[in-house]
From Swiss-Prot:
This is Photosystem II reaction center protein Psb30. One of its GO terms (cellular component) is photosystem II. NCBIfam families: PRK13686.1 (NF010239). A core subunit of photosystem II (PSII), probably helps stabilize the reaction center. Keywords: Membrane, Photosynthesis, Photosystem II, Thylakoid, Transmembrane, Transmembrane helix.
Length: 39
């Protein structure tokens, strides 16, 4: 548990948030394009 205590959680949350945006962005665009929606 010392390793977890030594880790700074803020950068981890930031990387996770950025990762979700990077993953969700193309998915949303693909769904809109698949449904024939215009951006």
């Amino acid at each position: 548990m010392e390793l977890l205590a030594a880790l700074n959680l803020e950068p981890i949350f930031q990387l996770t948030f950025v990762g979700l945006i990077v993953i969700a962005g193309p998915i949303v665009i693909a769904v809109l394009a698949f449904r024939g929606g215009d951006l």
